[in-house]
Every structure is written in C-alpha cells, then in structure tokens.
C-alpha cells in the first residue's frame, strides 16, 4: 500500500501544508507534521467531496447533503422551469442591488438551483457510505480559509445566483446554516481551480446552462477566471440541447474559449507545477523573477563608466551581478582575484563583455589635455636657436662655452667632466643664442640624447690632438637620430700636435663631410683657450638658424623641457626649464612629470630674477612640489586642480610600473632559479647633488648587472645623505653612494652604529670601479683543480692501527702530504678523498718527488690493490671577475 507525505499531497492539491493538515484532522486523520505519511484510503476520504465540488466550478457552495435531500425537488425545478429562468433573467438587476446585504438569500438560491438530476445520482453513488462526513469536513475547511481580503470576489457568484428569485424563498428557512458557506466558497475556489480538466464530464456540467445570460454582462476584474469556468459549464450544457435564448447565444463564445484560453491554462498552470490558483500566482511570481534576471538592460544602462581601475566588488555592483560570478570568470581567465582586487580597463572590458556590458574609460586623458594646438602662421615670431655642445670627455666643451660666455665655470668641475647640464644665454650682434652644455662621459648618454631632442643645432667639439673618440661617435649618432644639423668645432688647434685634417678624415667616415671637401657639414677650427675663431663659430650658428627659420608663438601657454633639476637647501626643488613655445610667467600653474606646482620665482643663467621667459629662453624655476626628472615635459596649465589631477594620475601609473618590476617570485620561478644557480643581489642607494648626475650614476650601476649577480638601485634622489637613507640601507642591506654630497652628522653616526657602508665620490669613474669590485667580492670563487703527482702501487702492507699501506712509486710530479687523492683502478675512480699519511722509510715526510718510493695510506679506505694508481691534486680558489 503506497503512502504519500503531507507536503506532497498539499502540492498536488495546490494548498498550504497547514491547511491540508487541518482538513486531515477534520476527517479524523491525525498527522504530526508536513513529513507525515498518509494512506491512500485517507486520501480518498479527503478528496471524495472535492470531486463532487469540482465537477461544477461555479456551484461549489452547494452542500452534498442539500443535494441529496432536495434531489427530487431539484429535478422538478430543473425540468419544470428552465424556460422561466430565461424569462426571469431581466430582473437580475433588481437582485444585484441586494447582493451586498442578504448573503444568506443568495446562498439559498444557489443551493436550490445547483443540483441536476444526473449530479444527484453521481453524488449518491460515490458518497452514500459516509454522507455526513464530507459535509462537516468541508464546512470546517472552508471556515479555516476565510480571508477578509477576498470579500470582493464574492460578488460575481452572488450576481449569477440572483437569477433565480423564485427559488430563493423556498430555501429561506435554511439561511442561517448557509451563511458561513456563502463566504467560504469564494475563498475555497483557489484550490479548486484545476477543476476544468475533470469538469469535462458532461453529466455533471449539465446543470449550468441556466446562468449563461447573467454572466456575460459582468465585468469585475478579480473574478475574470471564475467567469471563464462558468462559461465552460454553460457551453457543455448548450451542447446537451438545453433550451433558452441564453443557451443558444453562448455556444460560439464558449467554443472559442475552449480552443484558446483553456489550452493556455493547461500550459501555464498544469505543466509548470502544482495546481491551484494560489500556486498559480506563486508560479507567476517566480517566472517574473527569472525574466528580470534574463532581461537585458537598455543600451545606455549597459555602459559602465570607470576611471583607470575598478575593484571586482564595485564592478559586480554596477553590473547587478554577484561578485563570485566575476571572480569565477577571472579564474577562467587565469587570474586569481578577491572582491577587492583592482582591475584595469582592459581586464574590466573583457569581463563586462562576457556579461553583456560595455566599459567606458572616463579617466582624464592626459595626452589630450596637454596636446598643443597648432599655431596660426601670423602668430609665429622668430626665436633664438638652441645650441647643444657635445663631444668626448675633456675635449674642451666647457672651455669653449666658457670662452663664449666669458665666464670661468671650469673651476667648478671635478676631473674635467661636466657633472650636469647647464643652460646659458649668449648675445651676439643683438641676437641671442641659447647654449646647452652636456657631459661627455658615456654614463650621461641619456642626458645627451635629451639634449639632442630639445636642441636646434649641435656643435660637435673634437680635439685636434685627440681625434674621434667613442663619445664623439655617440654624439653624432644622437644628433642624426634627432635630425639635428651638426656644426663641427675642431678645438685645441693652438697645440703643436694638432692635426685638424686627420679629424676631418675620421669624421668623414661617420658621414660628416666638410664643405671644403664637397659636403654639407660646417667645420670651424677654434681654440677655446686662445679664443681663436669664436666669432666665426657663432656666425655660423646664426647662419644655420636662419636657414632653419626657427619660429614660435610667444602668446600661448608655456611648454618646455626640464633640462636639469636639483634640491636646493634654502629654496627647495629647483629645475632649469628650457621654454620651447609660449611664455612662462611668475604665478603660472604647471605640471612636469609626476610633479606639479606654481611658478614662485624665476632666475636666468646669471642669477638675475626674471618675471617671464619666452621661447628658447632657459630659466631656473622655483615652486615644484618635488624634484622632477631631467627630460620631463614642462606644461603650464590654467588652474592648480588640473595640474594636481594630472600629476596624481602619473604618480599612480609610475607606482604600478614599479610594482610590476619588483614582482615577487612564485614557487615555480624560485625553483627554476635554484636549479640554475643562486642569484646574488647587491642593493645600492644613490644620492647626488643634481638629478642628472643621480640618473647617470644609477644607469651606469645598472649596466653592471650580470646573470650571476644583480645590482638593484633601490633608491636614487637629490640631496644630502639622511637618517632615512641609512635606515633604508639597514633594512635592505644596501650600500650608500654619495655623489658630490656628504652625509648629515646624525646620519653619519647612525651609519657607523648600524655598520652601513657609505661611499662618497666626486668622479663617476671611481664610483663605478668600486661597485664593480664589491660585486666581484659577492661572487663565489671559481674552484680549479691543480694536478700534483701520480704514484703506482707496487706492494701493500697491513699495519696495525693504520690499516692498509700502499708501497708506491712516484711516476711524475710529487706526492704531497694531506693532499686530495683519487684511487684509479683500470682508469676508473674507485675512491676520492684525502691522503691520511705519507712516509718514506719510517719517517713522515712533507712530499716525495718523482722517482722515489713511499708509503701512502688513504683516509678511511683499505681496499688497495697492486697496480692501482694514486693521483694527488689540490683545489685552488680563484676570485671571479665580472
């Protein structure tokens, strides 16, 4: 005997578990909870009355007891007055007015009108064994389902029943008993909703035709579904041949409903899940939820605006999905992320596309803001040429510039090398020329490259007594790459060993052919020391400038390049700016690299204060928030807010770049490094007097890195060596290099206390050489085997406490006591270890030379045989060179 659980039966009937448990209790079946099992017999008891009720959806209110009692009367009414019902249909309006008040009257009418002859027979046949039980049971259940909110739905049934005013009086005495039933059937219809399929039995539905006419005019929205049930019954009745105008008119309408709405009802209600109006409503709600999830938002709502980066959680929130879905999608892409993981624009775009969204980057477009608008031809005016002096170390670049400026700046140079770029103004015959002085050492390649980019003309200084050198070639290459015309100044022609013709010959190999030899390169032979041909050199510069037609717009916002930057103790960050277009004024806001500021003061190359700087004019600017890098583009902006925003964005990008460089090794990478050999690191902190020198030293040190040892410049800045630098060196086990700077007193004391190595230099050669030596000291020494000698075993002796002793003859070299030895048997190594003792006759000896016999014992090894060969060797440690 199969059993069904309470909750399963409740789902099938389309009612709540509690309601079903109440019904079961009413028929005498005790259940403890919704998981309790019910026998089929109990289920039949429970569902038997429902079957009778569901046969006619409209007339649920009729009690089986009444039907049985009035069976004969009903037959009489149904047969005698079918026509009267149709005739009395018009008075419906009168009854409708009374619907609200006398509910009992309505019920009485229903009870009388409902029973049909066939229905009575069916009821008696099915339910005669226990007639009273279903009635009582139904009364209780309906009582439990009373819901005040459903009162409005009682109106349609009342209106239909009102069509039989003649029958109502006969049931008047029973009103009190029917009163509760009047309200309950309205609420009871929800679970009884699925009746249509079962209602297909013609016998049970034959009683409905009398109410066809009243139903049509009703237009109460909440009861739309209930009216459809009534129509279904009427249609069947009409088919059975019932008479009356109502029965004739409705069949067509009922036929349409049966083919369309009824099929839809099957799809919507029966297929998705449990039956019942209540359940149907629940199913509809669920389906609406699903549609909401699948629904694609409008195109404008599918665009998510982000600025540079966005976290996983924020992106999920804006797309209206769970963060776990995004994390799962990232994992499929090979990215392990958390809810707070930042996503760049590209990654966010990939994710959003997968979920049907678009990403719009609303970050500030720095390039667009800083882009310079083209100038009108009428706004352009002539500007002075910017001339860069380039050449090899100590070929006289600074001497030449000194001679031109008539100022002695050479005394401030260490080792004959210009330590940083200087920018100067020179006036000749009322026309100005701006000079940039670049260092000659190869470490300053980047600075020379920057100098070539901002310059109009390059003066290549070559010593007549030295000729073309490596830095000379680099200068030529930089100038050609920048497309800058070159004027060659052959310096030091006053020296007896000067050979200007040789210089021309060597430069011709580099593609610089003198005009005298049919080329287009201007050569001027000068002497900076004796001031020979200097005016001629300047005239050639101005002539070349005229050919280039150099022009700029002085009326626009200033734009230029940071030539040099340093941290001044009294003035803070100071930078030399070469204005290339526009005019820079005191009070202007600006941005340069990751720093911004406001021009608080400006000085020219002579130290005089100036209020403005036009095109091609160098000026020392005070007002930076930090020390910018040499070569950064300097742009004047309208307000501080914009400058600050651009600087902060650049700082963020710089941080991301730095983090990408210093990523931690994964376990797999670490294992690979261990397999390949341990990599050693040397950490260095560089401090200097000017930014250009710091950059040059740092770049030179980075070039010393090899596969075996890695040099990391963990910090490089301008200014004196401070306690912060020492603390950083302590934490990272670094060496501090000071270039033209000294440590503070407290920093010096802290360095001595912590044991931090602080090196101070004035010339870059010394710094590079010392670091190179330090790196060599970090490398493991190379182990090399040195052969000492070979001896043949000719006899073996067993000596107490010493084991087996080999009587040997030295074949070549010498056998040395305590040396490393190998024992070879048929040229196969059978032992490698240390010599325990070496004796000649009975005396211990230091060594035994070729051609002599000796006794040799091996450490912890006695398996010695005649004919074996003993090789002696030692391991030498050789320092590794970079």
Swiss-Prot record:
The tr-type G domain, residue ranges: 382-551
Chain positions covered by the region annotation G3: 437-440
Residue ranges with Basic and acidic residues bias: 151-163
InterPro entries: EF-G-like_DII (IPR053905), EFTu-like_2 (IPR004161), IF2_II (IPR044145), IF2_N (IPR006847), P-loop_NTPase (IPR027417), Small_GTP-bd (IPR005225), T_Tr_GTP-bd_dom (IPR000795), TF_IF2_bacterial-like (IPR000178)
Compositional bias of kind Low complexity: 236-246
Disordered, as annotated region: 123-246
Region (G5): 527-529
Binding positions (GTP): 391-398, 437-441, 491-494
PANTHER family xrefs: TR-TYPE G DOMAIN-CONTAINING PROTEIN (PTHR43381:SF5), TRANSLATION INITIATION FACTOR IF-2-RELATED (PTHR43381)
Family according to the record: Belongs to the TRAFAC class translation factor GTPase superfamily. Classic translation factor GTPase family. IF-2 subfamily.
Entry protein name: Translation initiation factor IF-2
Species of origin: Geotalea uraniireducens (strain Rf4) (Geobacter uraniireducens)
């Amino acid at each position: 005997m199969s059993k069904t659980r309470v909750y399963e039966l409740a789902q099938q009937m389309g009612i709540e578990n509690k309601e079903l448990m109440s019904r079961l209790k009413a028929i005498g079946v005790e259940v403890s909870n919704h998981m309790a099992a019910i026998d089929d017999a109990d289920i039949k008891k429970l569902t038997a009355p429902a079957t009778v009720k569901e046969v006619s959806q409209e007339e649920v209110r009729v009690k089986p007891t009444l039907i049985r009692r009035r069976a004969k009367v009903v037959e009489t009414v149904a047969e005698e007055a079918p026509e009267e019902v149709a005739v009395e249909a018009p008075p419906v309006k009168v009854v409708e007015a009374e619907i609200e008040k006398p509910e009992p009257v309505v019920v009485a009418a229903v009870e009388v009108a409902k029973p049909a002859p066939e229905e009575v027979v069916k009821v008696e046949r099915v339910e005669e064994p226990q007639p009273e039980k279903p009635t009582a049971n139904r009364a209780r259940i309906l009582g439990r389902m009373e819901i005040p909110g459903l009162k409005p739905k009682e109106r349609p049934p009342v209106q239909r029943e009102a069509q039989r005013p003649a029958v109502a009086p006969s049931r008047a005495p029973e009103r009190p008993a029917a009163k509760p039933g009047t309200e309950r059937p309205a609420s009871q219809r929800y679970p009884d909703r699925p009746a249509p399929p079962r209602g297909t039995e013609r016998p049970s539905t034959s009683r409905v035709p009398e109410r066809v006419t009243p139903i049509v005019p009703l237009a109460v929205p909440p009861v739309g579904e209930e009216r459809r049930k009534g129509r279904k019954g009427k249609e069947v009745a009409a088919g059975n041949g019932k008479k009356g105008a109502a029965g004739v008119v409705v069949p067509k309408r009922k036929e349409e409903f049966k083919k369309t709405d009824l099929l839809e009802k099957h799809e919507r209600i029966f297929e998705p899940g449990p039956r019942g109006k209540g359940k149907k409503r629940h199913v509809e709600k669920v389906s609406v939820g699903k549609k909401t999830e699948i629904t694609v938002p409008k195109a404008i709502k599918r665009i998510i605006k982000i600025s540079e980066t966005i976290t996983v959680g924020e992106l999920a929130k804006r797309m209206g999905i769970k963060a776990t879905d995004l994390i799962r999608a990232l994992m499929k892409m090979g990215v392990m992320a958390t809810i707070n993981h930042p996503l760049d624009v590209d990654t966010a775009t990939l994710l959003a596309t997968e979920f049907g969204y678009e990403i719009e980057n609303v970050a500030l477009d720095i390039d667009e803001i800083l882009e310079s608008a083209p100038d009108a031809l009428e706004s352009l005016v002539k500007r002075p040429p910017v001339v860069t002096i380039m050449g090899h170390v100590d070929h006289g670049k600074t001497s030449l510039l000194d001679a031109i400026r008539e100022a002695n700046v050479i005394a401030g140079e260490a080792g004959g090398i210009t330590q940083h770029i200087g920018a100067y103004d020179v006036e000749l015959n009322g026309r100005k020329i701006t000079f940039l002085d670049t260092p000659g050492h190869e470490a300053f390649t980047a600075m020379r490259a920057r100098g070539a980019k901002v310059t109009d003309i390059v003066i290549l200084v070559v010593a007549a007594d030295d000729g073309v050198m490596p830095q000379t070639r680099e200068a030529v290459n930089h100038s050609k790459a920048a497309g800058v015309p070159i004027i060659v100044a052959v310096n030091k022609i006053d020296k007896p060993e000067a050979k200007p013709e040789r210089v021309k010959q060597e430069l011709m190999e580099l593609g610089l052919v003198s005009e005298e030899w049919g080329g287009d390169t201007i050569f001027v032979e000068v002497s900076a020391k004796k001031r020979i041909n200097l005016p001629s050199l300047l005239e050639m510069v101005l002539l070349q400038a005229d050919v280039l037609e150099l022009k700029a717009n002085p009326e626009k916002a200033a734009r230029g390049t940071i030539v040099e930057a340093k941290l001044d103790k009294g003035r803070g960050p100071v930078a030399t700016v070469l204005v290339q277009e526009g005019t820079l004024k005191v009070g202007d806001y600006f941005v340069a690299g990751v720093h911004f500021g406001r021009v608080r003061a400006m000085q020219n190359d002579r130290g005089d204060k100036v209020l403005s700087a036009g095109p091609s004019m160098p000026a020392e600017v005070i007002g930076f928030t930090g020390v910018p890098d040499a070569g950064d583009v300097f742009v004047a902006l309208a307000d501080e807010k914009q400058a600050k925003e651009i600087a902060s964005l650049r700082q963020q990008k710089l941080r991301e770049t730095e983090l990408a460089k210093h990523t931690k090794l994964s376990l797999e990478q670490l294992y690979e490094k261990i397999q390949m050999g341990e990599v050693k690191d040397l950490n260095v902190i560089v401090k200097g007097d000017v930014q250009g020198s710091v950059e040059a030293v740092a770049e030179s040190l980075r070039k010393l890195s090899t596969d075996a040892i890695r040099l990391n410049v963990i910090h490089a800045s301008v200014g004196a060596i401070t306690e912060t630098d020492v603390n950083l060196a302590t934490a990272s086990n670094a060496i501090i290099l000071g270039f033209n700077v000294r440590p503070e007193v407290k920093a010096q004391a802290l360095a001595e206390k912590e044991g931090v190595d602080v090196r101070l230099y004035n010339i870059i050669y010394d710094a590079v050489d010392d670091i190179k030596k330090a790196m060599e000291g970090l490398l493991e020494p190379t182990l090399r085997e040195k052969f000492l000698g070979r001896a043949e075993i000719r006899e073996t002796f067993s000596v107490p406490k010493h084991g087996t002793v080999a009587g040997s003859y030295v074949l070549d070299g010498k056998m040395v006591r305590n040396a490393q030895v190998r024992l070879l048997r048929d040229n196969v190594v059978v032992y490698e270890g240390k010599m325990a003792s070496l004796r000649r006759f009975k005396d211990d000896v230091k060594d035994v030379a070729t051609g002599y016999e000796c006794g040799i014992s091996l450490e912890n090894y006695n398996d010695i045989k005649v004919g074996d060969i003993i090789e002696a060797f030692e391991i030498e440690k050789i320092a590794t060179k970079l």
